[in-house]
């Protein structure tokens, strides 16, 4: 994809393990034309990692979906919906957390605590992965460099977060 292309993509977190691509698309189609819906699966087990992405045809549909779906129930779970960072932005995925991926609050985080992880220490699955994993988590602070995807993603990184985030970044010490 050329760097000038614009995608209207939402990050959807907190998904039930049973939610599939089709259920995700169906839930979001009421807001506009869905171009793509994708649940991210663990490459070793094939199971859902509890998050995914929905891409819309236009910006209005994306913004309406974020407004309408964030905090709503889908398949028995309250989901989080945010605008996804494009793959081309954020300086190529540099990870500024240093060391083990940006835990700053000592005991593994909690929602604020100076750049800790959104989901706490181990994510929502055994052995890391899931919504936050071991690699920093969602950080609303500029220097956090957090990782939505969690620590088990090859090469560290993960989705977005902080300055210099970037989807699928391979820089720095992110992850386990």
From Swiss-Prot:
One of its GO terms (cellular component) is extracellular space. The keyword Acetylation applies. Residues 88-175 are annotated as: Glycine-rich (GR) required for cell-to-cell movement. SMART domains: RRM. Changing residue 49 to Q: Impairs RNA-binding and consequently impairs the regulation of its pre-mRNA and its downstream pre-mRNA target RBG8. Affects the alternative splicing of numerous targets. Induction: Up-regulated by cold stress and down-regulated by dehydration stress, salt stress, abscisic acid (ABA) and mannitol. Circadian regulation. Induced by hydrogen peroxide (at the protein level). Up-regulated under P.carotovorum SCC1 (Pec) infection. Residues 88-103 have a biased composition (Gly residues). Residues 83-103, 131-176 are annotated as: Disordered. Its main location: cytoplasm. Interacts with TRN1. Interacts with the Pseudomonas syringae type III effector HopU1. Binds to small phloem-mobile single-stranded RNAs (ss-sRNA, e.g. small interfering RNA (siRNA) and microRNA (miRNA)) in the phloeme exudate, including viral-derived sRNA (vsiRNA). The glycine-rich (GR) domain is necessary and sufficient for cell-to-cell movement and to interefere with zucchini yellow mosaic virus (ZYMV) infection. N-terminal part of the protein is one of the crucial determinant to confer RNA chaperone activity during cold adaptation process. Plants overexpressing RBG7 display retarded germination and affected seedling growth under salt and dehydration stress conditions, confer freezing tolerance and also possess enhanced resistance to P.syringae. This is Glycine-rich RNA-binding protein 7. It comes from Arabidopsis thaliana. The gene is RBG7.
